[in-house]
A protein has these predicted regions:
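A metal-dependent hydrolase metal-coordination microenvironment
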Residues: 1-25, 41, 46, 53-76
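Active-site beta-loop-alpha junctions enriched in small/polar residues
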Residues: 14-18, 44-46, 79, 84-91, ...
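Acidic-and-aromatic substrate-binding clefts and catalytic sites of carbohydrate-active enzymes
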Residues: 20-22, 110-118, 144-147, 152
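Histidine/acidic residue-rich metal-binding segments in metalloenzymes
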Residues: 24-33, 55-103, 116-131, 152-168
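Conserved, mostly hydrophobic/aromatic
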Residues: 35, 81, 106, 134, ...
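Non-cysteine beta-strand/loop elements that form the S-adenosyl-L-methionine
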Residues: 37-44, 105, 130-136, 170-172
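Short acidic/histidine-rich active-site segments
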Residues: 137-138, 165-188
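Mid-to-C-terminal alpha-helical segments outside catalytic/metal-binding sites
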Residues: 186-229
Length: 229
């Protein structure tokens, strides 16, 4: 926020797939020392930390014992736990294990688009109850099962999440580096179109600041403050 006030842009770095930790818990500290702010526990397939929402063999039945250690170490170091890509059992296990709020950096509503990678209304409620954030993603196949998504579909997913979780627990996680992008929101240069769509729906400046990173920064700050205690 200080950088923004000074006219500077900031980038937050993360790791998508805890596979990078290998089987060495000290690697969590290694990555934290290099400025990582969050780790997505898994990707498309089970790893040593937890079972995935896609291509899962139910390897651990949720979060593994090593995965529980990883989450505890992330809590200790002030890193956000990201449950996008995690299977449903892994999701609830991680919520129970973590002593700080959790994020889903790029996940949509399964009620609107019934694919395993999206999260259910029950998961959304549990995430909000734990103080976490779900960020809507712009990946076609997670917005509509036919893959023909528009900005209207992205807004539908956002507003469904707001209805279930509250405005304090949502955001946008475009996933432009992972096949995200739809007509009118193809890349970062077109994100202003999302803001315009929110303005047409009479969202306040305060609400838009929460959607556009305020909620994410709240969780990040809580995690970092918890690590300092």
């Amino acid at each position: 926020l200080r950088n923004k006030r000074n006219g500077l842009r900031s980038l937050l770095t993360g790791i998508e797939n805890g596979l990078a930790i290998e089987n060495d818990i000290s690697n969590v500290q290694h990555f934290a020392n290099r400025g990582i702010t969050y780790i997505t526990l898994c990707h498309n397939g089970d790893n040593q930390i937890c079972d995935s929402a896609r291509h899962s063999l139910n390897t651990h039945g949720g979060v593994s014992p090593f995965g529980a250690q990883v989450i505890a170490e992330m809590n200790r170091l002030g890193l956000m736990v990201d449950l996008s890509h995690a299977g449903e059992k892994s999701f609830y296990d991680a919520l129970q294990i973590s002593r700080t709020p959790i994020v889903c950096s790029h996940s949509n509503s399964r009620a609107l688009c019934d694919v395993p990678r999206n999260i259910t209304d029950e998961q959304m409620r549990a995430l909000a109850a734990a103080g976490g954030v779900c960020q809507i993603t712009l990946y076609n196949g997670f917005l509509r099962t036919d893959g023909n998504a528009t900005i209207t579909d992205a807004i539908r997913h956002l507003e469904h999440a707001i209805d279930i979780m509250g405005i304090e627990h949502v955001g946008l996680g475009a996933d432009f580096d992972g096949d995200g992008g739809i007509p009118g929101l193809a890349d970062a240069s077109e994100l202003v179109n999302f803001t315009k769509a929110l303005l047409r729906r009479r969202y306040s400046e305060t609400d838009m600041s929460l959607i556009w990173g305020g909620n994410w920064l709240r969780v990040m700050n809580l995690c970092q403050q918890s690590a300092q205690r």
